[in-house]
Amino acid sequence: MGGERVALSPGMATYRRTRRRVRSRRSTPRGYTRIVTTPLDPNLPARHLTSTKVVAVRGVQLEVRDDIVVGEEPLEIRAAGPRQQPVNVAVTMRTPGFEQELAVGFLTSEGLIAGNEVTGFEAGDPGFMAEPDDAIVVRLAKKLNPGIAKPRNFVATASCGICGKASIDDVAVRCEPLPKGLPVVSRAVILSLASTLRAAQAAFDRTGGLHASGLFEIDGRLVVIREDVGRHNALDKVIGSRVMAHELPLWDRILMVSGRVSFEIVQKAAVAGIPIICAVSAPSDLAVRLADRLGVTLVGFLRGDGFNIYTHDGRIDLRELMGVG
């Protein structure tokens, strides 16, 4: 049915009015047909998103209809040096797509390899009833780091990337503090990041069920965005894409994430050399402490025309608000 296009609020989807106007942030409003304008990456597998039947209850009305849900499958990450048998490193629950980036980003951000060690990839045997790309072998130029070869109990869930590590020592990747005097970014650029990231979230538009990580130039231009059911996976895919492009360290980039900031997000960003992390939601206390120690600028609650700077505020140019310059 035709009708006017109604923008519900900045950063939200546009809907076509069919009956009466209702606002909603979490699902298609009753009386509207969702219009998705951001195209999906053509490199994504069909399993990235799937269709399922739902019984939708809206007030006193119900409807049986198709709904789009995000894919979630295990990925077994293995690694092997020259003339070595692959070693199982981790199993992570992820949204299918960009498996090579995820594997390389994971190994790099966990401090297990350096980016220039990767020589190629092989498909692993995922076992019974798994998809062919549910296991990947990362081939390395030199023999395995002892940190990879030691026994591990490493199962990363979508919500907890560090769950199941063998010891507390495994949680803290040793990372040197970032150099001081890294880029200073304008307030206007910081304020633009959330809406730019949201506008590029093609899969979220269809499901409402994905986290996103975006890497930006210091002038606010989006370099790469990745979406995944796990926030740490989305970041690993971003980091992996830059490792494979031989761009690390990322000292002149900004990271924007769609949710909260945990210890692990700060750790992974710092390993990649990212000096500024921005988030729509709050950081944890451990994330703040780690960012402070590693010299990372941490920005939270980036919404509308405001944000909070938790650490190393010198990288955000606030002179106009202070009547200076």
Over which residues does each language-model region extend?
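Feature captures the catalytic cores and cofactor-binding loops of soluble hydro-lyases/lyases
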Residues: H232-L321
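Amphipathic, positively biased hydrophobic alpha-helical segments used for protein targeting
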Residues: T14, V22, N116, A172-C175, ...
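Hydrophobic alpha-helical segments
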Residues: T119, C175-L178, P183, M244, ...
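N-terminal amphipathic/basic-hydrophobic helices that include classical n-h-c signal peptides
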Residues: M1-I35
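Intrinsically disordered, low-complexity regions enriched in acidic/Ser/Thr/Pro/Gln residues
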Residues: I35-S213, E217-I225
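A mid-sequence, solvent-exposed acidic-amphipathic segment
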Residues: A194-S258, E264-I265
